[in-house]
């Protein structure tokens, strides 16, 4: 967790988040990032070449993104989860036809500064979508077949798209993430068995 105090008697404010940052966690992330940059630098024969610069740039960009996400209210992710998931599906479709191809796989979108891999973001996108979906429906509807159609599509669509890149490892992680969230939502095991046999 990014903050020292695990709970507040009121919702987190920006001030609360700033003054309760877990400095140990922040330092650990920065230290690992610096070590990885020096490891890349060393593997390049002591030359700060394209790969070293690219790695350093990605670390800085995603560390800033990490901070932005941490300071963003949870209500924002709750209200935009469906939209985020939809955009990620569009990006996966884009990758399938127009993505950057390397070593037999087509997984990346060229953003000129960096190559973005939507399948990695989809791991989070599936969790956001399903969490919000199950939050919106009543507990009694969780095990009804008609309410399970959306989660099944939301899990299988990105799974199939990522598998076709091909990227088996990421596809399996997306599938497992979806199954775990669905199980935590209260879906019975016999329904999992039914869909597995189907």
In which residue ranges do the predicted regions lie?
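N-terminal Lys/Arg-rich, disordered targeting/topogenic segments
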Residues: 1-10
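Intrinsic disorder/low-complexity signature
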Residues: 1, 17-19, 164
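Hydrophobic alpha-helical transmembrane segments of multi-pass inner membrane proteins, especially
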Residues: 26-198
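N-terminal membrane topogenic signal
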Residues: 10-29
């Amino acid at each position: 967790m990014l903050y020292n105090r695990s709970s507040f008697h009121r919702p987190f404010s920006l001030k609360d988040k700033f003054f309760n940052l877990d400095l140990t966690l922040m330092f650990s992330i920065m230290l690992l990032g610096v070590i990885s940059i020096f490891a890349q630098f060393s593997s390049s024969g002591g030359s700060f070449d394209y790969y070293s610069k690219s790695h350093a740039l990605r670390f800085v960009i995603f560390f800033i993104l990490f901070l932005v996400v941490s300071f963003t209210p949870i209500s924002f992710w709750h209200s935009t989860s469906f939209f985020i998931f939809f955009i990620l599906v569009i990006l996966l479709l884009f990758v399938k036809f127009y993505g950057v191809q390397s070593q037999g796989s087509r997984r990346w979108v060229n953003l000129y500064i960096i190559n973005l891999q939507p399948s990695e973001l989809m791991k989070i996108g599936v969790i956001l979508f399903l969490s919000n979906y199950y939050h919106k429906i009543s507990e009694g509807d969780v095990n009804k077949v008609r309410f399970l159609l959306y989660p099944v599509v939301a899990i299988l669509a990105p799974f199939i798209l990522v598998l076709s890149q091909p990227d088996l490892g990421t596809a399996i992680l997306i599938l497992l993430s979806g199954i775990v969230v669905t199980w935590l939502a209260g879906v019975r095991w016999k329904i999992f068995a039914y869909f597995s046999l189907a």
